[in-house]
Amino acid sequence: MKLFVHLVLFISLFIPYFTKAALYVDIKKSSVGNIGLVVSKCTCKTALESELSENIAKVIGTNLSNCGLFNVKRSAEAESKSWKSDTVVTVSLSEISGSALELSFRLFDAFTKRELLTQSVVFPAKDWRKIGHLVSDVIHDRLIGEKGHFNTKITYIAEEKDSNYKSVRKIAVMNQDGSNIKYLTNGDRFVSTPRFSPNGKGIVYISYANGKSYIILKNLKDNTESIISAFEGVVSAPRFSPDGKSLLISHSLGGETNILSLDLSSKRTKKITKGSAISTSPSFSPDQKYMAFSSDISGSQQLYVIDFTNKSKKPKRISFGSGRYATPVWSPKGDLIAFTKIQSGKFYIGVMKPDGKEERLLSEGHKIESPAWLPNGREIIFTRTESPSNSKLYLVDLVKKNQKMVSTPTNASLPDWSYF
């Protein structure tokens, strides 16, 4: 219990404090250069201290390098004249018992010779990776002035061929750095579109069996699952409301495809769109006052927004570029909507303002789709399919449009990223 209290205090007290004291870097400007960062570890007394301090330093370095805002270097030295203008992170461990250690870390500005922060935390040895992520969050907060996302998770559809060359799909979840992959389903049924609940404690997904569509909620703590609702016809594109009390879904039945709201307490549904148009891919704004979706109301697939504060709730078209638009997703900051664009046989991932202005295309490919936001609102994860047997997850940032593949052991698609 003592270890747990130490860890909770570390998370709840120090991260907010360092955020307030941040050296705010304007990450919205494309001209911003990366921050030089040296990750160093101190001399250790025991083999366990040496092993875990190296592991933690590696996690910190990888996290901060991958976020695209730091130029990270590793050093075996605790101090060096060569660091000059770098910011330096030093990590040291002291073994308290066979199962507990105390981590001390120090953030130092080598240019001004000023100590930016120093802190320690006691933790169980088995939680070394989590500690690495938490320290990464603190450093990110202190230097960028923005909450880090290193202790979050990714869910996606993992797909591979069995011994009979039959495609097997499973719901997978892993840490944001690709570690600790778990499969939440066993591949005995078709599954699709996993989505995190706002509190991060569950994942909702769609399964199809016996001519019905099932909306299923998986509890990530005890690995149990429950059927939220079953529908005749095809249900797709589930999306939680920001308050976690309802789901938006697309429902196809009798030649119509409309968007429904499903109350998770009463299990009652309410039709939001009506008519013969195909309306799908709903997404709430963070304040839950608006909903973005795609529809062919105008004859071709475009993006629309409904204002729930307006009595008429009439859809307003926001996409007017050439081509078709699909899979809109509202950013966690509320300032942008990500989407998939299909034009002249090519696919694009792009963003626009909620009123449709300032459309920007971030990535182009043979088939790229299914964008989902990272909780920082600066990066997007999406699916890139190069061939029917090769689909992977990629990240793209809004400022520099840098892309990198997210490593997974199998084909991967339909990603979602957990909230803070």
Curated annotation (Swiss-Prot):
The keyword Ligase does not apply. It is found in: Periplasm. InterPro entries: 6-blade_b-propeller_TolB-like, PD40, Tol-Pal_TolB, TolB_N. Pfam families: PD40, TolB_N. GO terms for cellular component: periplasmic space. It comes from the Bacteria. One of its GO terms (biological process) is protein import. The keyword Cell inner membrane does not apply. Keywords: Cell cycle, Cell division, Periplasm, Signal. Its main location: periplasm. Residues 1-21 form the signal peptide. The Tol-Pal system is composed of five core proteins: the inner membrane proteins TolA, TolQ and TolR, the periplasmic protein TolB and the outer membrane protein Pal. They form a network linking the inner and outer membranes and the peptidoglycan layer. Belongs to the TolB family. Part of the Tol-Pal system, which plays a role in outer membrane invagination during cell division and is important for maintaining outer membrane integrity. HAMAP family: TolB. This is Tol-Pal system protein TolB. The gene is tolB.
